Amino acid sequence: MIETKRDKVQKFTIVILTIFAIVNFELLFLKFININNSIISLYTKISIILLIFYISYRLIKNGITVQRLLNLLPDIIFIFIGLLVTDSERVFQFFLIGRQIISLINMRTLSNNKGKITDKISDNPPVLVMLTFFFTIFIGSLLLMLPVSTVHGEETTLLGAIFTSTSATCVTGLIVYDTGTHFTLFGQMIILTLIQIGGLGIMTISSAFAIILGQKLSLRRESIMQNVSGESSKLDMINLVKNVIIVTITLELLGATILYFTFISKSYNINSAMYHAIFHSVSAFCNAGFSLYPDSLMRYLDNFSINFAITSLIIMGGIGFPVMKDIQRTIKNRVSFKRLSLHSKIVISSTIVLLAMGTIVFFISEYNNEMKGFNFQDRMFASYFQSVTTRTAGFNTIDTSNLSKGSSFASGILMFIGASPGSTGGGVKTTALVVVLVAVIAMFRGHKDVNIFKRKVSEKIIKKVMALVAASVAFLALMIFLLLLVEPFTFEKTVFEAISAFGTVGLSMGITNSLSSAGQIIIVLLMYLGRVGPLTLMFAISETKDRSYFTFTEEKISIG
């Protein structure tokens, strides 16, 4: 094979990028062990110049378009950070390492070689989803480490930044720094942006930009959107993206309006009331649970407006966009709700049942415990709010660290179940719960088929659900075991923290701030994989095609 000039240039570029990545790592090591060296600053300036040269080369070679400018936006942002923000060498060098790794992955050294890494990634939607979340967390961590992101005198460590960025992007709500006092307005806006991106999904937002720019969604992007949104078909995917954006903005603005008038009545000034209203509205709809108050929403336990607005936003964000679209279509066409899709019927019915059961359980369990001394109205508010938020939101109006054992157990179950497919929440999802329960009931009754609302559930779906639940339980059990090894906390608190992270809930029994570095890393993994999904992970690292070319002889085994 004759090596072309382009191949030589690409190989040379890979060598240069590799050298720069290694040198960056070495300089960061020197920085961490407090060795002051003027070479570090000089190298940072050279790196900025090279990055400017790289951007200019790309634009001159390919031409200037809106899409290409959007693709180069992270590079442009970090050039300004490197030039304008003081004490940003460490952050900029972290960005360069990540940028160079991405460049190495994107380089197509062997143009005629099939099975390139980039092709395998781009042809596998689950892998793309995982990588987009990963790089969003990476960029968010860098931004949160900037001096401008924290108040004067405070410092955000690398692990703390990764933890916070992961929690925001995966819409969890577990924190190692108090959001309202540790971070500046800039840092809080970074967190809010990560929440919105993580809640809607990176692919949803990028697809929305593509539609705005007048581009058509490719089959590959439609496949990714189908995976992210929970749609059962690829039909009308452009309208789905539009509806997701419109519904999100409408509901968040509506929730923010209700919260704004409530905060104004609490002696907030206009700007503060507006900002707090928008922040908590977005956080609630995205099921994130981030609050600007150190006690979450405990101060508003008896406030009807805030309880109503927050819980409504959480529920709407948790049922999923396909269900909201189905409800909208049903109302618009003035047809019976019996015409809803099977998916919508399962989600709505299971949500109502779980909310009702959760409210009753918390009302009984905390009657003489955390709610002792409350009047009936406050008990109902607190019980209902706890039932709603435990399923993935993470806000709280009562002290979660003082929950009774019964409430802790019930919370663990609700957190593991989580929200619904295509929603902003996590967990194994309500549809999985219903399918498993109905399948077990059908087996006990001797029924061959699994039927829900007079519709048969395919065997393929049942196998996927079983795989999802099994993978979730196995992964969660492993992470709990590791947490118990590295942390001194009680079994109850450790299990609660792990399930909360995996279900992207954000409730804690007060141990998050005291976690060791190893414990924080485990929680980060739980939050990330809890949001991406165990089943997505399984599909991402293995071929999904059936490779069974023959079958073995069947033989019975003893069970029980």
Residue ranges of predicted features:
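Membrane-proximal intracellular helices of multi-pass ion channels
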Residues: 1-560
